[in-house]
């Protein structure tokens, strides 16, 4: 019985099949390794090895962008090396302004300023004659021979016009002051010629006091009383007017 059962068990056993299928060989990629795994590149500007890969320019694998930590500048493989300053900057350079500010010339030159002012203060009429004859022309409006109107801009012309306007106002003010100082006394009082100035009459007072001192004539003549208590005063003025007519 034992032998029969053992034979039945051995005859029903099936061995496992071993898979002998080999894996296919790996395909070798022809792509270039990533710049991160490449050896460190030298900076084309300073030949420093302290560089690193940043990113791909315009998402193109053929234009990797690197950064140099030594000179702190970027460069792209196959691209032109631009002269970008450290930290970056705008391409528009700040050009210095070529416009020159025109300084307004003084009213009087340095050499003759004190003499001209003394002449204006002490002798206004003489200074007025010199101005009318062109004596102050060199002091009022000195011109710079190096000034070139063709190279000036709108701003310089506007400033020049403002200076010229100020000088004209100063000249008018000085001219009006000279005219007032040179006018005679009779012309200054022209506006008062139509006013009649009555000189004080000394005849009335002298006559009244003479009559009062002698004690007579103060109450002489017709006594006119207008109910205001001024009858004597009216009589005095009446007699004074009669004596003045005589």
From Swiss-Prot:
Biological processes annotated in GO: floral organ abscission; positive regulation of DNA-templated transcription; regulation of DNA-templated transcription
Tissue specificity comment: Highly expressed at the base of all organs of the flower, especially in the abscission zone (AZ) of petals, stamens and sepals. Expressed at low levels in sepals, filaments, stigmatic papillae, tips of young siliques, and at the base of pedicels and leaf trichomes.
Binding site for Zn(2+): 43, 46, 68, 71
Superkingdom per UniProt: Eukaryota
GO cellular component: nucleus
Main localization of the protein described in the UniProt heading: nucleus
Keywords, ordered alphabetically: DNA-binding, Metal-binding, Nucleus, Transcription, Transcription regulation, Zinc, Zinc-finger
Listed Polar residues bias regions: 1-12, 27-37
Annotated spans, Disordered: 1-39, 216-235
InterPro entries associated with the record: Dof (IPR045174), Znf_Dof (IPR003851)
Zinc finger (Dof-type): 41-95
Membrane-crossing segments per the record: none
Subcellular localization: Nucleus
GO terms, molecular function: DNA binding; DNA-binding transcription factor activity; zinc ion binding
Oligomeric form and interacting partners: Interacts with ZFP2.
Function: Transcription factor that binds specifically to a 5'-AA[AG]G-3' consensus core sequence. Involved in the negative regulation of floral organ abscission by binding to the typical DOF 5'-AAAG-3' sequences in the promoter of ADPG2/PGAZAT, and by down-regulating its expression. ADPG2/PGAZAT is an abscission-related and cell wall hydrolyzing polygalacturonase. May act through the interaction with ZFP2, an abscission-related transcription factor.
Note: Plants over-expressing DOF4.7 fail in the abscission of floral organs (sepals, petals and stamens) after anthesis.
Name of this protein: Dof zinc finger protein DOF4.7
